[in-house]
Amino acid sequence: MDKDLKKVVVLLAPPNMKNSKANKALFDAIKEMDDVAIFNLYEMPDENILNMDAWSRIISHANAVIYQFPFYWMSAPSLLKKWQDEIFTYLAKTPAVAGKPLLVATTTGSEFDAYRSGGRNRFTVDELLRPYQCGAVHAGMIWQTPFVVYGMGTCLLYTSDAADER
């Protein structure tokens, strides 16, 4: 994992990346960028996911941290939550994360209008992400406005093959 000492650390956490269109597109947009290290938690060996020493070095070296995940039941998938509980909880008490930006990049199945007062989900995504913001602030990080892609469960995604058939 130390070979990935980069300036931006992306914790990628879609449980089913193979079938993900939106998270795969976000991944494809950044995977070749210099100084970006992407760690797909669902493809890492178990012993690396919770390796405190390795994560401490990686995060200490980074200038920014990004959590990228599909929004599952108003939260992150379980493996990112486990990483937060076991790694971030420790790092939050050290200088490793202090002063660094934390960005959440997430995709939702529901459309934008579902995430508002009176909408199907009753709250905005910003409101639902408040625990992440609270954790960042508590750790001395700089909370960034979340990057949210809405409506992945409700939109039609066209491929070049589909366009050729029309």
Give the ranges of each region predicted by the language model:
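N-terminal beta1-alpha1 ligand-phosphate binding loop
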Residues: 2-34
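Cofactor-binding loop segments of dinucleotide-utilizing enzymes, especially the Rossmann-like FAD-
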Residues: 13, 41, 107
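A short beta-strand-loop structural module common to alpha/beta enzyme folds
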Residues: 35-47
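Structural motif
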Residues: 46-53, 156-157
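Helix-loop-strand module that forms the ligand-binding subsite of alpha/beta enzymes
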Residues: 53-133, 139
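Active-site rim beta-loop-alpha module in soluble metabolic enzymes
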Residues: 148-154
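Conserved small/polar residues in nucleotide/adenosyl-binding loops
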Residues: 158-166
